[in-house]
Amino acid sequence: MSYKPSAKTEVRRNRYKVSVDADEGRRRREDNMVEIRKNKREENLQKKRREGFNPSMASQPGQDFSSSLPTETRLENIQQMIAGVMSEDRDLQLEATASFRRLLSIERNPPINEVVQSGVVPHIVQFLSRDDFTQLQFEAAWALTNIASGTSENTRVIIDSGAVPLFVKLLSSASEEVREQAVWALGNVAGDSPKCRDHVLSCEAMMSLLAQFHEHSKLSMLRNATWTLSNFCRGKPQPAFEQTKAALPALERLLHSTDEEVLTDASWALSYLSDGTNEKIQTVIDAGVIPRLVQLLAHPSPSVLIPALRTIGNIVTGDDIQTQAVISSQALPGLLNLLKNTYKKSIKKEACWTISNITAGNTSQIQEVFQAGIIRPLINLLEIGEFEIKKEAVWAISNATSGGNHDQIKFLVSQGCIRPLCDLLPCPDPRVVTVTLEGLENILKVGEAEKNLGNTGNDNLYAQMIEDADGLDKIENLQSHDNNEIYEKAVKILESYWAADDEEEDIGGVDAPENVQSSGFQFGNQSGNAPTGGFNFG
């Protein structure tokens, strides 16, 4: 078999793409990579509906237009309920609004669309201004909260009726239950879409929301306010950082809560705020959240662990100094634990992605990864992990070969990285193949340097190890790959580290043409001599 470049390779040289370089080693999160984000809490609870329990302020059934009746029957009463809302009688207003609230709070399939289509929403919104009638404000806020838990069209009706500024005003109500219900409603509106979120923020909701976090807040308020705060920070395009960064001091305090729901939503909020430029990352670091986030890597609940890991992963996409802030907070033992124990695929994948951004740092940071004992478990995942995990683990190893010194690369080889790297070469993901080739090339460079120093005789031992791992055949096969970047990288490696061996085989062969230049092509047994200038295919 000839390991020289094929004729196809020569034709394609002019379309060569630049391979992975040092600047690409540290990666921001790619949208198509973020499977971990698709957990139930993250995707399904952008909105929440309040069901029909009875807090102290909830109106008790009196002249109840809706309670204990089938939905169809209750819908038949909707005109009577609308008449009650539009009445001048305070008691009828309250009871009708409470009836709508109960109708919208049933457990399954609440008739939100039917209520919206009845045209009653703007009238209920007006009740939010009734500072003289706190109970009516509460019932109206609850009903509107549940309408806002519906479709985007439902939420648009709430916004178009002018409810958002009124909800923001209610955050200053003397009634904690009214304030909490307003918090919930704003969370549902903001959770609908980035456009709705930005509308809420434009109504100066952030500072009023942050005022709800104090030492006397009830747990239910803390839970709702933290969830709403996370909705204020989430979504792409991202909200204006000048508005959302004001939440950082509160989020730092919330991270020390013992409540799982509060911890979960506070951590998600931080993950959104840390997803961006180095300037944003630095602002998050300056808030002092890293030590507690590192502690949360050991939290027993995945719902807390996942966003904490996500935030740490975002921070290490920053520069070396920002990455060092994570390392210095003892994050590496926590990441090692995630690799070694029986966590689900998405967590291991995220941990590998985080480590890959640390190994994209300087040599001392790579050394700290080595000293933490992370490399062998990482290589183990490269050997036996699911493919989605391998895709991230190979980045971690390849980045270490790119930024590591010769001794560090020799250590990687001693830990058994060559064979699993070679095993990834036939994989269908071009990016993974490219990154794998980069890692192998960096290893081969060290092997060549050792040979030139006379430490390994006349042999590049790492080239031999790659050949023993069936890597040479796989690299040679990549010359026919459809991706220019891959096959050019394969050609470069073959020319640099195996061409001499191939030439010796040609020269020593019994039927080798006498005058074919080393850059020519061998076609098998030939008795005729080639032209001294090589074959002309023009």
UniProtKB/Swiss-Prot annotation:
Any Gene Ontology biological process: protein import into nucleus
Localization (cell): Nucleus envelope
Ranges for the ARM repeats: 109-149, 152-191, 194-234, 236-275, 278-317, 320-360, 363-402, 406-445
Listed GO CC annotations: cytoplasm; nuclear envelope
Comp. bias regions, Polar residues: 56-69
Protein name: Importin subunit alpha-6
Domain IBB: 1-58
Transport among keywords: yes
Organism ancestry: Eukaryota, Viridiplantae, Streptophyta, Embryophyta, Tracheophyta
Gene3D superfamilies linked to this entry: Importin-alpha, importin-beta-binding domain, Leucine-rich Repeat Variant
Bias (Basic and acidic residues) ranges: 7-46
GO molecular function, one term: nuclear import signal receptor activity
Family: Belongs to the importin alpha family.
UniProt function note: Binds to conventional NLS motifs and mediates nuclear protein import across the nuclear envelope. Acts as a cellular receptor for the nuclear import of the virD2 protein of Agrobacterium, but is not essential for Agrobacterium-mediated root transformation.
Pfam families hit by this protein: Arm, Arm_3, IBB
Top-level taxon: Eukaryota
Self-association state and partner proteins as the record states: Forms a complex with importin subunit beta-1.
Keywords for this protein: Nucleus, Protein transport, Repeat, Transport
Segments of this protein annotated with the region Disordered: 1-69
SUPFAM superfamilies: ARM repeat
